[in-house]
Amino acid sequence: PVKNNIPQYTTVVSTGIGGIKLTIGAEVDCVWNYKPNLKEGDKENPLNHYVELKTNSIINHPKSLFAFENKLFRTWAQCFLVGIPKIIVGFRDENMILRSVEEYETEKIPILIKNNTFQSDNNNGGNGGKKNVPKFMPSIKFLGGFLAWLNENIPKDDENKAWKLKYNSETNKD
């Protein structure tokens, strides 16, 4: 295995989904403009200044748009849960040269994807004209339900015990 000794910056936040409270750690890619200095009494929330960085190939056909929207959905979920407000995507060509940069506000991504007019025509990723938009709120509700199930079903009497959950996509089809 290759070791990465590059320093990483992480943040830890307390959040909740439904009645479940979570403490989540996340790597932060960069700070947009400045990082408030909490040691000096700055009361501003540092999360407001954090940014997630992504790269993507230039979108030049329906399948690449479909792949990008799925990537943006996964990035949205990560940033939404932690509270990172901005995502910056660099679009590169086939020679890995950066050609354009787009900024996205995390909270606006569900509407952006839902209102994508290209999604509603017959060319969206080769799935026969079926509108295939990521389900943002159902995904969060599923996570909340799953965490509630875990909370109810995993015994809390032995904190040293590890649990392994498995999902078999072959037996758990829609």
Predicted regions and their residues:
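Accessory terminal regions of nucleic-acid processing enzymes
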Residues: 1-174
